[in-house]
């Protein structure tokens, strides 16, 4: 995939998530590529906090062990496979025809997008402060939930977006 194709996929993910899901599914990535992408997503996750870590004083980071790069990697290494399995199981239970590789590619891509949005939010927060950071992070989570609903609807082949909403809720709750 070229840089222009990647940029278009990022834009489509935010503006036309169903088209982005179709594009991701059509890539038909093999399991070794998916595992590599998952590892990349896990390892890159701490970079979303890089601006905060670089430009914050040591005093402001007291008690911030939960957000250390090692902890972020450990949590992501546990959560990402669980999230993929949860979405796949929920899609199947709700009558969808989702394939594991299709669910994996959209979940991994969505998590990479969340990391990108968190990084951008952290950069903006350097200028705008912590209140702006909280606002941008909340907006990022809402956007990602909307993207998850659209992606799950496409990969599971549901006939109703409301079934996908329920699927996303069940995947995160269960």
For each feature predicted by the language model, list its residue ranges.
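Alpha-helical transmembrane segments of multi-pass integral membrane proteins
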Residues: 36-48, 109-114, 171-174
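Selected alpha-helical membrane-embedding segments in polytopic membrane proteins
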Residues: 2-101
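Hydrophobic alpha-helical transmembrane segments and adjacent short intramembrane/lumenal linkers
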Residues: 88, 93-173
């Amino acid at each position: 995939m070229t840089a222009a194709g990647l940029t278009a996929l990022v834009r489509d993910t935010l503006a036309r998530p169903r088209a982005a899901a179709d594009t991701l599914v059509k890539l038909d990535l093999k399991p070794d590529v998916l595992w590599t992408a998952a590892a990349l997503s896990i390892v890159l996750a701490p970079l979303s906090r890089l601006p905060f870590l670089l430009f914050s004083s040591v005093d402001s980071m007291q008690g911030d062990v939960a957000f250390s790069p090692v902890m972020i990697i450990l949590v992501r290494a546990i959560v990402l496979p669980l999230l993929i399995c949860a979405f796949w199981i929920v899609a199947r239970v709700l009558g969808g025809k989702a394939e594991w590789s299709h669910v994996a590619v959209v979940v991994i891509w969505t998590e990479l997008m969340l990391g990108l949005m968190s990084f951008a939010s952290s950069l903006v927060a350097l200028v705008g402060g912590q209140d702006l950071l909280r606002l941008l992070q909340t907006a990022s989570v809402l956007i990602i939930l909307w993207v998850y609903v659209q992606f799950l609807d496409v990969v599971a082949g549901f006939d109703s977006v409301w079934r996908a909403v329920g699927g996303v809720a069940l995947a995160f709750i269960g």
